């Protein structure tokens, strides 16, 4: 018996179930939320996130929708994060909405302990950073459409 602490590695699906439970309960001050994109997704890969634009920034009063994809190596590897809502941020590709790990340290320095909640909170903090807080934002909603990798134009309509 050594004096070193043994770390218990929680299996991927148990970890995602914990995150789902936490997301369903509501987190923090209510300015970020997340949950499963498809309840029938038995691999628990596709998630949605929401960030309410922080006060006193160019994002104030806006609701930003995101897609998070947790591959088979999550939580060892970070999820892929894509803004569905149009947004102007230094770490987001303006063409496809993907958060660029090379410009968002949390993704490039991902650790197993990080969660989707942590990720959304950090993106909200990034919105408040000096380099992003005053950036001019695209028109409301997704009226211009965002072209996906297959060349399709993605549009959103709320009825």
Curated annotation (Swiss-Prot):
Belongs to the ubiquitin-conjugating enzyme family. One of its GO terms (cellular component) is mitochondrion. It comes from the Eukaryota. Has no ubiquitin ligase activity on its own. The heterodimer with UBC catalyzes the synthesis of non-canonical poly-ubiquitin chains that are linked through 'Lys-63'. This type of poly-ubiquitination does not lead to protein degradation by the proteasome. Mediates transcriptional activation of target genes. May play a role in the control of progress through the cell cycle and differentiation. May play a role in the error-free DNA repair pathway and contributes to the survival of cells after DNA damage. CDD domains: UEV_UBE2V. Expressed in roots, shoots, leaves, stems and flowers, but not in pollen. Residues 11-159 form the UBC core domain. Pfam families: UQ_con. PROSITE patterns: UBC_2. This is Ubiquitin-conjugating enzyme E2 variant 1B. It comes from Arabidopsis thaliana. Induction: Not induced by stresses. GO terms for biological process: positive regulation of protein polyubiquitination; postreplication repair. Heterodimer with UBC35 or UBC36.
